[in-house]
């Protein structure tokens, strides 16, 4: 239950409030005096009060402003004493208006700090924060009334330049710290020739080519075009063999990188010069290109110019037959190419088996690598030709491995003339009986390997006088094929098999040399009977003609 106050109770409470002390309103900013002493004084300071405060600060120093009232008997609060000393009684205070230099400094400081009056007063000795604030507020009102900008143009430009400089200094410092961190963990990768194996534009192997001279590798003609090829490969090998990091290795690394870039270009030139890229037709009237990379069934022989990746190859393989060399042959001939001893078996993989078709390049000046000229191959081929009359020869595979362009057969007008002549003399399919000496004469159980389609063999007319001089009663030797057989590829035409025949005519050897050194091997056709048709290479048209001789017995 609530107790209701009576009139007597209300009168007693009012009497107690009248007897309690009241705060002095005249005190200068201090809290109401609740003690038993006199009340604090408010209002402006008198000269007597200023003298008491100055004397106290000289004796006790600045600070502890609440003790002024106790020690001096001055009836002012601590806050009032501090402000009076800082704004009016300090000995280093500057009186009067601000100078032009002080005004310029205030504008610059305000553009950087804003309304930080105490911090700005620290940069202006003798000026108080209150004076700076009053000056700035007065200036803003004056500029607004006159329509002038608060900050002058010079101050704005200076501020923007300083900001950009600060940002650039920060970026430079950050980059420097990153460089120092990277320098502590410096890593230099090894540049090896193995990095170029996966590249379709590079060589299929990375041998130590220092053992192979340029003259033996590509001949004098190609060496003059890219004489810096061996130097670049040697530089790459030297970098790979280096064990430690030298202080001046940065210049060497830059040179190696530029050499590696040029090495890729030179490797493309090497591939084109050796004849691995594309082989053109020898007939000048035809522009059809026979791409590289067809597959031949039943051929695993060196006379096809193919290296087996499944069989190890030991020692140097010298693709040269001394008895068949000619002094006027092309120095870039494949017969002078010698494989380096450091060549490993696993490095003999044909890169075109897994690479896409490259862009057709210029016509190669090198002879076809199909004519290896090994004595064992000649003997074995002669034996196979005697027993291969009843064997079936498989058709050229339309494609090899992944990414390998299909094989293409290019026909020439001379081929049609030869076909018409053959049909008049011997009824039956022309291509089935026109089988050259090929590497396909080996067993058909051997797996197919990659091969190329060289240039076109051209047929030319032979005068009756020439036919008589070569012997009219003999026939041109060549293997027999059944009517149902398909002729093997003409790129493997081997006139070296003539040595295994029973003949002692010196012209046979001359004709074999002439046909062996021919660059442009082409269409499927064989020497035929009669006095009007014979083989002739487009690039070696001035060489002796092949004579007619009896078949193998």
UniProtKB/Swiss-Prot annotation:
Primary residence: nucleus
Pfam family, one: Myb_DNA-binding
Start-end of Basic and acidic residues biased regions: 1-17
Keywords: Activator, Developmental protein, Differentiation, DNA-binding, Flowering, Nucleus, Repeat, Transcription, Transcription regulation
Domain of life: Eukaryota
Family matches, as PROSITE patterns: HTH_MYB
A single BP term in Gene Ontology: anther development
Region (Disordered): 1-45, 464-488
Protein name: Transcription factor GAMYB
Species this chain originates from: Oryza sativa subsp. indica
Induction: By gibberellin in aleurone cells.
Function text: Transcriptional activator of gibberellin-dependent alpha-amylase expression in aleurone cells. Involved in pollen and floral organs development. May bind to the 5'-TAACAAA-3' box of alpha-amylase promoter.
């Amino acid at each position: 239950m609530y107790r209701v106050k009576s009139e007597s109770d209300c009168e007693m409470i009012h009497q107690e409030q009248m007897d309690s002390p009241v705060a002095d309103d005249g005190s200068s900013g201090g809290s109401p005096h609740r003690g038993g002493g006199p009340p604090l004084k408010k209002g402006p300071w008198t000269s007597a009060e200023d003298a008491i405060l100055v004397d106290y600060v000289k004796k006790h120093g600045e600070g502890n402003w609440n003790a002024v009232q106790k020690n001096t008997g001055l009836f002012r609060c601590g806050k009032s004493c501090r402000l009076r000393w800082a704004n009016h009684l300090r000995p280093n205070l500057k009186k009067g208006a601000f100078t032009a230099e002080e005004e310029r400094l205030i504008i610059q400081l305000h553009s950087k700090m804003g309304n930080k009056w105490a911090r700005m007063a620290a940069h202006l000795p003798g000026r108080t924060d209150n004076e700076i604030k009053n000056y700035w507020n007065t200036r803003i009102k004056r500029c607004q009334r006159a329509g002038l900008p608060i900050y002058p143009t010079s101050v704005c430009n200076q501020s923007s330049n300083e900001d950009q400089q600060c940002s650039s200094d920060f970026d430079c410092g950050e980059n420097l710290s990153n460089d120092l961190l990277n320098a502590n963990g410096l890593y230099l990768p090894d540049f090896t020739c193995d990095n170029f194996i996966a590249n379709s534009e590079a060589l299929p192997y990375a041998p130590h080519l220092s053992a192979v001279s340029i003259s033996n590798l590509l001949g004098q003609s190609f060496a003059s075009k890219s004489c810096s090829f061996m130097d670049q490969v040697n530089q790459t090998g030297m970098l790979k063999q280096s064990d430690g990091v030298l202080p001046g290795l940065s210049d060497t690394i830059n040179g190696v990188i530029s050499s590696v870039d040029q090495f890729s270009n030179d490797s493309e030139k090497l591939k084109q010069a050796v004849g691995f890229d594309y082989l053109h037709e020898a007939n000048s009237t035809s522009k059809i290109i026979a791409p590289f990379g067809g597959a031949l069934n039943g051929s695993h022989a060196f006379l096809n110019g193919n290296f087996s990746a499944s069989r190890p190859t030991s020692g140097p393989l010298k693709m040269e037959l001394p008895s068949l060399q000619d002094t006027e042959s092309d120095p870039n001939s494949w017969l002078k190419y010698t494989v380096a001893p450091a060549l490993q078996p696993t490095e003999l993989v044909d890169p075109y088996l897994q690479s896409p078709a490259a862009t057709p390049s210029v016509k190669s000046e090198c002879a076809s690598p199909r004519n290896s000229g090994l004595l064992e191959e000649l003997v074995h081929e002669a034996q196979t030709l005697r027993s291969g009359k009843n064997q079936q020869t498989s058709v050229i595979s339309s494609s090899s491995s992944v990414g390998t362009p299909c094989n293409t057969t290019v026909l020439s007008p001379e081929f049609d003339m030869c076909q018409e002549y053959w049909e008049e003399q011997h009824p039956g399919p022309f291509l089935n009986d026109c089988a050259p000496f090929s590497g396909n004469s080996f067993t058909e159980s051997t797996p197919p390997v990659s091969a190329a389609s060289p240039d076109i063999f051209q047929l030319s007319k032979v005068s009756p006088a020439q036919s008589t001089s070569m012997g009219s009663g003999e026939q041109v030797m060549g293997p027999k094929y059944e009517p149902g057989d398909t002729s093997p590829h003409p790129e493997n035409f081997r006139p070296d098999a003539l040595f295994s025949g029973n003949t002692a005519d010196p012209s046979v050897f001359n004709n074999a040399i002439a046909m062996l050194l021919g660059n442009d091997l082409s269409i499927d056709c064989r020497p035929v009977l009669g006095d009007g048709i014979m083989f002739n290479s487009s690039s070696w048209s001035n060489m002796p003609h092949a004579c007619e001789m009896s078949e193998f017995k």
